[in-house]
Amino acid sequence: MKKRNLVLILVMMIILISSCSQATTDNATKGPITVATMIDSEGAILGNMLLLLMEDSGFEVENKIGFGTPDILRKALESNEVDLVVDYTGSGQYYGAVAAAAVWSDPQLGYEAVQTFDKETNNIEWLTPAPANNTEMLAVTKSFSEENDIRTMEDFAEYVTNGGEVKLICSASFSDNPMGLLGYQNAYGFQLTSDQMIVLSHGNTAEMLKALYDGSDGVNVSLVYGTDGSLQEMDMLVLKDSKNVPPVYLPAPVLRGEVAELYPELRDLFTDTFESLDLETLQSLNARVAFGGEDAKIVAEEYLKEKGLLD
């Protein structure tokens, strides 16, 4: 009788220990996952969305939003210094992915090219991107557009060819790029001279847009990125590029493969959020931070809750 009781006690203890162990496993903190972004309003907004969604799913997260420039961010990801970043599909051509120019100008083909390359070469996974092209484009003020009937790159080319007054402000990397200004000139048949341009060593479009807005040094055309937050607030018009000259840059979460294998739920955690972010939405969100001075985390949280993506 005593032996039977002893066996029963031992069985119950085993069950209890097993249950406690399972509970500990189920409640264990997942992570930590280090999230990093570039230094801009869009990086801050999208990075905070990633942080909020992961924390809501029980992940411990290390915040490195505003980590650095694109090259610094990429090196940190490749060296396992960070786990999850926000990057842009068109950048794949600079990371080593080889494809024809037409591939990078196609949203789906460009995504597939960098996705395949990084997975096979670096064990880095590109997750679902947002349908918002943050590529290099040219913008004018709406008043300039209306006065000169310029809404497209075809219109702009005709204006230049007919001797219209032009002062373009842009970055050196854009002015010398066959898929930037050189590509635009070849595709649309116009030519700008050096005295029609102000070329900066950096790509800070906030400074360029301010020059356009103020008309500094006669600037009436500026390099912009498609989702720049100041475009709506500053009453700017982006010239339509019907020939898709520059590469398409869709923002996407990019995750180290080892982390994706350890936590496979991360592959789908951000899908609904990024699919909801079209060009106008990102412009509006960026404007609240870059132009309105709102806190990026609050903007991100309000958006996620409004869309039913966060409790």
Feature names for model-found ranges:
Residues 15-19:
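C-terminal motif of bacterial Sec signal peptides marking the signal peptidase cleavage site
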Residues 135-146, 249-263:
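A bilobed periplasmic-binding-protein/Venus flytrap-type ligand-binding module shared by bacterial periplasmic
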Residues 108-167, 275-279:
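A conserved helix-loop-strand patch within extracytoplasmic ligand-binding domains
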Residues 83, 162-241:
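Ligand-binding pocket segment of bilobal, Venus flytrap-like solute-binding proteins
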Residues 20-28:
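Bacterial lipoprotein signal-peptidase II cleavage site
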Residues 69-101, 112-115, 206-211, 226-235:
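Pocket-flanking alpha-helical
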Residues 28-42, 50, 59-66, 164-170:
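Short, well-ordered beta-strand elements
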Residues 96-127, 191, 230-243:
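Ligand-binding "clamshell"
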